[in-house]
Amino acid sequence: MDQTKVKAILDWPEPKNVKGVRSFLGRANFYRRFIKDYACIARPLHDLIEKEEPFQWEEPQQTALDTLKRHFTTTLVLTFPDLDCKFHLESDASDYAIGAVLSIKKDGIWHPVAFSSHSMMPQERNYPVADKEMLSVIQALEQWRHYLEGARHQFEI
């Protein structure tokens, strides 16, 4: 990883206003597919720009910023999807976000292919737990349909 880029990310200043948070999230959203549970991690930052309240940077926002910076500067190796390998889809839901990881089994080891993470709409946050979990499965199946329908083996959920 290019050390000048790593330094630029690590030196990213604490946002002083909503515009600064939007700027950071704009860059962060590009890499969301490489970060497990991105929506949960970034939630405090999104809450800050969505609220009609005065800008107030607190511990949850700082933790989210620091966690995202750490993820951006840590090399995570995703593998290419191989339709000859067995796929595994793992999903989860929290009170406000859904997420999933698609993996393949190579040489007896599961390797991540992609991550998915989305914030739930306000009405979806009212769903019962089982419905939230099913929503995460449906969203993941829709997102990775092109891999799973072409797979030569059955896939696991």
PLM feature spans:
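Conserved beta-strand/loop block within the catalytic cores
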Residues: 76, 83-105
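Short amphipathic alpha-helical interface segments
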Residues: 83-86, 110, 149-155
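A short, polar/acidic, helix/strand-boundary loop motif
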Residues: 106-135, 139, 152
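C-terminal reverse transcriptase regions that engage the nucleic-acid substrate
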Residues: 1-85
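Substrate-binding beta-hairpin/strand module that engages nucleic acids
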Residues: 40-48, 146-157
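Metal-dependent nuclease catalytic cores in nucleic-acid-processing enzymes
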Residues: 28-31, 133-151
